[in-house]
């Protein structure tokens, strides 16, 4: 059975605007992020989905509530789709940090390895593929989490493709399908802007 996963990056926060690492810090949507989610809602209204999942972080939960407010479906929280931890870098300005440190295999900064982040996101999707009868899912998560999973899929296929910075804008839609034993990225970072 084919499965379709509509993956949504949460709306903007003050730390997004200030270009700070957020990771698992629970930073709420900014006023701009709330407006982004409201503006994106008509795009999500056009999609059919049978279940809604969200990261436990408030910026994802609030985005999920806004874009699905007319649906009569519960929002299910799952820790496996939380953002990647950036350890001691959380709250720091991105431009002030050694980005290379964030991509080593054994991070010494107290954060999460990007491959582990991709692995747990995949585990979440694999559970839905193997143990759930539904076919269409809305998943509100984070740019790092979704992006690391996509990168891992590209690596499996032998592609040396890297997602450019900004490819997953706030409130954007990424569509991933599972069929015939494999995941396929159909759309990345789509917005109607």
Spans of features found by a protein language model:
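Generic beta-sheet signal
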Residues: 5, 135-144
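General small-molecule cofactor/ligand-binding pocket signal
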Residues: 6, 76-78, 186
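Active-site-proximal alpha-helix that buttresses catalytic centers in soluble enzyme cores
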Residues: 8, 12-71, 112
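Glycine-rich phosphate-binding loop signature in dinucleotide/nucleotide-binding domains
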Residues: 46-48, 128-135
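Short beta-strand scaffold positions
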Residues: 54-55, 119, 140-141
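Phosphate-handling substructures
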Residues: 69-123
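Domain-level recognition of soluble alpha/beta enzyme cores
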Residues: 157-184
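Short, solvent-exposed aromatic-acidic interface loops
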Residues: 186-193
């Amino acid at each position: 059975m084919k499965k379709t996963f509509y993956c949504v990056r949460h709306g903007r926060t003050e730390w997004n605007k200030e270009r700070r690492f957020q990771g698992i810090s629970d930073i709420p949507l900014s006023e701009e992020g709330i407006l982004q989610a409201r503006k994106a809602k008509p795009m999500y209204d056009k999609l059919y989905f049978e279940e809604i999942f969200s990261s436990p972080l408030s910026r994802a939960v609030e985005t999920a509530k806004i874009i699905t407010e007319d649906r009569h479906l519960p929002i299910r929280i799952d820790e496996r789709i939380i953002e990647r931890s950036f350890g001691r870098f959380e709250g720091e300005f991105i431009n002030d940090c050694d980005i290379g440190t964030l991509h080593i295999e054994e991070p010494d900064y107290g954060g999460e390895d990007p491959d582990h982040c991709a692995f747990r996101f995949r585990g979440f999707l694999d559970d839905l593929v193997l143990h759930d009868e539904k076919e269409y899912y809305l998943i509100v998560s984070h740019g790092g989490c979704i992006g690391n999973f996509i990168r891992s899929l590209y690596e499996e296929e032998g592609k040396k493709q890297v997602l450019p910075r900004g490819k997953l804008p706030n409130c954007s839609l990424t569509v991933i399908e599972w069929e015939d034993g494999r995941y396929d990225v159909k759309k990345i970072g789509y917005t109607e802007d």
